[in-house]
Structures are given as structure tokens and as C-alpha cells.
């Protein structure tokens, strides 16, 4: 398995993507003196005997309660146990791994006051594939992702359930099997440092971002095939049009659409004497819509990359002056905004894809047999797959409502404005799954429609895509059970096979120089 070294404060997006895909994180040893220095600063701050939030006081609304020195370990244990109040299904393993890696780099900046052995245990747990069970629901994204991260901290002290190589076990049993030892106690500040932060929301948002990147690339591929199937023009993809407007995402998307269609005999067949003046927007405006989505995703990526490398704890420890400063870096509003942008992009990618499906199955718009079946009437063809796509689009429209505009006071109004980042980020994988199905249906419909143009061939890239889908799904000559075909085509979208089939460099989150 690939190991990724994380240097706190400067981890690139490619490393977070690799961790989402299953790589194992290892913290850069160069940050160890910084971590140790931060823990020593906490001890010096405590020695002054003054109240410092979260170190020798209660939490939230109880911040005015002073805790005696002999109860500081109990204070940290209590916050972990009491805050582990999440509900719902366990979060996916790759989300949990990403969350823990984010927390490691956050703590590795040396502003949280945790000990080296605390971070070392997190790294060892990830290396052993020993993952805390993190209930998916319960965070409002301020004061950080308290409940999810509390469940992580519980596992680290041997409490609750975990997954060891995918098997659900008690934490105590799993640590024994893995040959690891949980922390016997949490030092001053450590419980709060583990709980405070946006790592769960950020992990979910990054997961949604990486899925959205793949989906956008897939949509450009299926959209190009639909353009060919509809005998659409590539003239609207002329670079001069897009350079005049100036949006980089739009320019990038127009470039790849033009490249994907280059050399097509289908396009050449209607280059002259075409009675149609303009294609419908779902064909003609692909660069504008996909480009705007790409721009949103790139903006979200910038925000999430900054958040991933930043420190979202409270209070923050400054060893050079032995200060503990209280602030609000735990408020996940930047993550919530980024998640909302990703949701908007996913929704629109699916929406315009469904419109291309609807165009292809409508003989008045496509000029092909109704519902893309050779014998309409006796056969219904792609009638209901389009309905399924419409249903999925409608679901995504509801989920795309911005989560960040909602807030509800918590903790006796001490935490009176919250971000809802966790909810906003968690929905992204559900939305992405819906768009995968929509694009899978478009891939089927576009491949079927291109069959009606035989013996004319499309471009080499799009013919390779058609050949790949035909390995799994034969042409629809007569009605048959459609569900397996949709699952097979969606599998090509979800696995990235559809992208790889065209063998072209597609627009990515990291814009080409």
C-alpha cells in the first residue's frame, strides 16, 4: 500500500486525493520537535495557576467553572465520553481514514498542545487499519465536529467500538489483536484538542470534491458522445468564442469537447447543408455549464486545501510566548460554503445530462426512432431510463439547497451560530451516486443513438468509449430488463473506466499551467 508523508501546513491536494483512494499517511518526522514544544508550553501555562479555557476550566457554557489540578485528566476523559453522542450509520472507512489524517496534520502544526504519543497512536492505528466507528450524524460544524471526533478520541482511550481490517470489534479487543495499546489517560488540553476541529466535515467535503472531479470529467465524455449521437455541431466549442468570455473553466471544457470529437465521420456527414442553425442548450452550452461547475469545484478545492493545512483547534497554543488564545477557528463556515459549491456543481452536471438524455429519446428533437428502439410501440426502449434520470435530478435539486444558510443555536446559546458543514458535506456522496446513475443512463442512450448512424463512425476517442460500453452492454434491439444495463454503464462511470477509455487529458481540479 502507498504511504504518503504529510508535512503539516503544506500537504498538496494530490496527497489528500491519494489518502481518499486508500494510501496510508505518515507524519513528517521534522514536525516532532514542534509538537513536543507545544505540549511543554501547556505544562508551563498550567504552572502559572491561572484559568485557561479547556485546560483547567469547563467547556462551552461551563467555561467559567474552574477545575482543580488533580481532576484535569478526568476533565479531558469526561469531555471525550460525554461528547461521543453521534447517531446513525457508521461513516465509510475512507472518510474516517481521511478525517484522522487531517487531524494528525492539524495537531502536527504544534498549536494544540498534544503529546507526541497521542499523534503516534493515531498513525499506528491507521497503519494497522484500526478505525474508530464514527456515527455519521450529530455535528453542526461548530464548535468543530465535536461528536464525530469524540468517537475517534474514545477509540484512542480504548472505549467504544472500532473496525479492525473491516471487522467490527470493541476497541479493547481490537487494540489487543493489533498489538497496540490505547492511551491510558489524556493529558491537559488533549481531549479538547482531539474534539475541536473541522476534520470530519473537511474529510466528507474532500471526498465529495474528488468524486465531483471524476463526475465532471465523465460528463464531458458522455456529453461529447451525446453531441455526436444527436449530430450536434462542434462549432460552439470554437476556442475564439470562449477566449472572448475569459472563464478558464469554460475554456478548458470547450477544448476537451472539441478534442474528443476531432476526426469524426459522423460530424463530417452533416458539416455542410445542415438545415439546423443551432443545437439545443444542453448540447451547445456544455462548455458554459460544465466550465462553471469546474470553476466552482476549483474554488472549493482552494478553500478545502487551505482548511486541510490549517489549524481549527481552540484555544490555540503559542509556545514562543507561552500563550493560550481563544478564538473561533473551529467554526466550519469555509467548509460549509465549499460543500454548498460542490453540491451546486453536482446538481447542474446531472441536470444538463438528463436534458441530453431527454433530447435523444425524443424523435422530434433527435430525428431518431422514438426512445431509441428500432420498433417503438412494440418496444418502449429508453422511455423509463429517462424517467429514472429525471427522478434522480429532482432528488439532487432538493439536496442542493445550501446547508450553510441554516443555523440553530446550541450549548445554551453559547454556540449561537453554527455552520452545518457536516450535513452539507455528507450529502455530497449521495448526490454523486445519483449523478453517476444519470451519466450511466446517458452513456447507454448515447451509445445506442450512435448505432443508428452506422456505418458512420465517431472520433477515435469516442469509438473507444463505445467499444468499452459494448463489452458490457449489447445494443438494445428489443426490450429487455434495463436495470443490469444501467448498473453496468454506471459502473464504468463510477470506476473511471469511461474516462480512461477515451485516453485524453481531461480538465482537473489543478488547472494546467
Curated annotation (Swiss-Prot):
Biological process, per Gene Ontology: L-histidine catabolic process to glutamate and formamide; L-histidine catabolic process to glutamate and formate
Gene3D superfamilies linked: Fumarase/aspartase (Central domain) (1.20.200.10), Fumarase/aspartase (N-terminal domain) (1.10.275.10)
Primary location: cytoplasm
Subcellular location: Cytoplasm
One Gene Ontology term, aspect cellular component: cytoplasm
UniProt PTM: Contains an active site 4-methylidene-imidazol-5-one (MIO), which is formed autocatalytically by cyclization and dehydration of residues Ala-Ser-Gly.
Pathway assigned in UniProt: Amino-acid degradation; L-histidine degradation into L-glutamate; N-formimidoyl-L-glutamate from L-histidine: step 1/3
One GO MF term: histidine ammonia-lyase activity
Reaction(s) the record says it catalyses: L-histidine = trans-urocanate + NH4(+)
InterPro entries (alphabetical): Aromatic_Lyase, Fumarase/histidase_N, HutH, L-Aspartase-like, Phe/His_NH3-lyase_AS
Cross-link annotation 5-imidazolinone (Ala-Gly), location: 142-144
Keywords from the named record: Cytoplasm, Histidine metabolism, Lyase
EC number: 4.3.1.3
Record-listed 2,3-didehydroalanine (Ser) modification sites: 143
Family: Belongs to the PAL/histidase family.
Name recorded for this polypeptide: Histidine ammonia-lyase
Organism per entry: Hyphomonas neptunium (strain ATCC 15444)
Recorded name of the encoding gene: hutH
Amino acid at each position: 500500500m502507498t504511504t504518503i508523508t504529510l508535512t503539516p501546513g503544506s500537504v498538496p491536494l494530490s496527497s489528500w486525493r491519494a489518502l481518499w483512494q486508500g494510501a496510508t499517511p505518515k507524519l513528517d518526522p521534522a514536525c516532532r520537535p514542534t509538537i513536543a514544544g507545544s505540549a511543554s508550553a501547556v505544562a508551563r501555562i498550567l504552572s502559572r495557576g491561572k484559568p485557561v479555557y479547556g485546560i483547567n476550566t469547563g467547556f462551552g457554557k461551563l467555561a467559567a467553572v474552574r477545575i482543580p489540578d488533580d481532576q484535569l485528566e478526568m476533565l479531558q476523559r469526561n469531555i471525550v465520553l460525554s461528547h461521543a453522542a453521534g447517531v446513525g450509520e457508521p461513516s465509510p472507512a475512507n472518510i474516517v481514514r481521511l478525517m484522522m489524517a487531517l487531524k494528525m496534520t492539524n495537531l502536527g502544526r504544534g498549536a494544540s498542545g498534544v503529546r507526541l504519543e497521542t499523534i503516534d497512536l493515531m498513525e499506528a492505528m491507521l497503519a494497522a487499519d484500526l478505525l474508530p466507528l464514527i456515527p455519521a450524524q450529530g455535528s453542526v460544524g461548530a464548535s468543530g465536529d465535536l461528536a464525530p471526533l469524540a468517537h475517534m478520541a474514545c477509540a484512542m482511550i480504548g472505549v467504544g467500538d472500532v473496525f479492525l481490517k473491516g471487522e467490527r470489534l470493541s476497541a479493547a479487543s481490537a487494540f489487543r489483536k493489533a498489538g497496540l495499546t490505547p492511551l491510558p489517560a489524556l493529558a491537559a488540553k488533549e481531549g479538547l484538542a482531539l474534539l475541536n476541529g473541522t476534520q470530519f466535515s473537511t474529510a466528507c467535503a474532500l471526498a465529495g470534491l474528488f468524486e465531483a472531479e471524476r463526475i465532471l470529467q465523465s460528463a464531458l465524455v458522455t456529453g461529447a458522445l451525446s453531441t455526436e449521437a444527436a449530430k450536434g455541431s462542434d462549432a460552439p466549442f470554437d476556442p475564439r468564442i470562449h477566449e472572448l468570455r475569459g472563464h478558464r473553466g469554460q475554456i478548458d471544457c470547450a477544448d476537451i469537447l472539441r478534442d474528443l470529437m476531432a476526426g469524426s465521420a459522423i460530424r463530417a456527414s452533416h458539416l455542410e447543408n445542415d438545415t439546423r442553425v443551432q443545437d439545443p442548450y444542453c448540447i451547445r452550452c456544455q462548455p458554459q455549464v460544465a466550465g462553471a461547475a469546474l470553476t466552482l469545484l476549483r474554488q472549493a478545492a482552494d478553500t478545502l486545501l487551505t482548511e486541510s493545512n490549517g489549524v481549527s483547534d481552540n484555544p490555540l497554543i503559542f509556545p514562543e510566548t507561552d500563550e493560550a488564545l481563544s478564538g473561533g477557528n473551529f467554526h466550519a463556515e469555509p467548509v460549509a460554503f465549499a460543500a454548498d459549491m460542490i453540491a451546486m456543481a453536482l446538481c447542474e452536471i446531472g441536470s444538463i445530462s438528463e436534458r441530453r438524455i431527454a433530447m435523444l429519446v425524443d424523435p422530434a428533437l433527435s430525428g431518431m426512432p422514438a426512445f431509441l428502439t428500432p420498433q417503438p410501440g412494440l418496444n418502449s426502449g429508453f422511455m423509463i431510463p429517462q424517467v429514472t434520470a429525471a427522478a434522480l435530478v429532482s432528488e439532487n435539486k432538493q439536496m442542493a439547497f445550501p446547508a450553510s444558510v441554516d443555523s440553530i443555536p446550541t450549548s445554551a446559546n453559547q454556540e449561537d451560530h453554527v455552520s452545518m458543514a457536516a450535513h452539507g458535506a455528507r450529502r455530497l456522496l449521495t448526490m454523486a451516486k445519483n449523478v453517476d446513475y444519470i451519466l450511466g443512463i446517458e452513456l447507454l442512450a448515447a451509445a445506442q443513438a450512435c448505432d443508428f448512424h452506422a456505418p458512420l463512425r465517431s472520433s477515435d476517442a469516442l469509438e473507444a468509449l463505445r467499444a468499452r460500453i459494448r463489452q458490457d452492454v449489447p445494443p438494445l434491439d428489443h426490450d429487455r430488463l434495463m436495470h443490469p444495463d444501467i448498473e453496468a454503464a454506471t459502473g464504468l462511470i463510477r470506476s473511471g473506466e469511461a474516462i480512461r477509455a477515451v485516453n485524453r487529458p481531461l480538465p482537473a481540479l489543478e488547472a494546467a499551467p
